[in-house]
């Protein structure tokens, strides 16, 4: 089996640094990563309460702060009955023109931090008229 030449040692080193930053910023080894779509962060806070730690996504090496409407710029740690869950309140999209590396940086940092489970959400519209992507809330459905 050959190694894909795009996966250079520098790329792997970047992920190790980013993973270490995630672990030191959020005080411990997380069990899972959830990446939220537009407007979903408030619903999560209603369900799980305040996070135990927060770091700006842009402070993690290689991760670009989200700019899309409805996307937040935080990585939050929540204590749940099943362990620590990291929640990104937004993400960078490929259509923003930055290329695949910044788009996948958070996922690669999560793997380097020891996370083996992830959920990627999307709030791409609604069948109910009058609900925009950025105004979605669980109480309006």
List PLM regions with ranges:
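Metabolite-binding pocket within alpha/beta catalytic cores that recognizes anionic/polar moieties
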Residues: 2-141
């Amino acid at each position: 089996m050959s190694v894909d030449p795009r996966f250079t040692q520098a790329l792997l080193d970047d992920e190790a640094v980013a993973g270490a930053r995630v672990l030191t910023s959020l005080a411990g080894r997380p069990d899972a990563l959830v990446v939220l779509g537009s407007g979903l962060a408030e619903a999560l806070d209603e369900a799980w309460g305040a996070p135990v730690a927060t770091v700006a996504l842009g402070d993690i090496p290689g991760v670009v702060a989200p700019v899309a409407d409805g996307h937040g710029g935080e990585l939050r740690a929540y204590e749940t009955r099943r362990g620590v869950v990291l929640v990104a309140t937004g993400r960078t999209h490929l259509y923003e023109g930055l290329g695949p590396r910044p788009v996948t940086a958070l996922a690669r940092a999560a793997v380097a931090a020891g996370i083996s489970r992830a959920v990627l959400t999307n709030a791409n519209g609604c069948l109910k008229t009058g609900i925009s992507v950025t105004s979605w809330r669980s109480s309006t459905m």
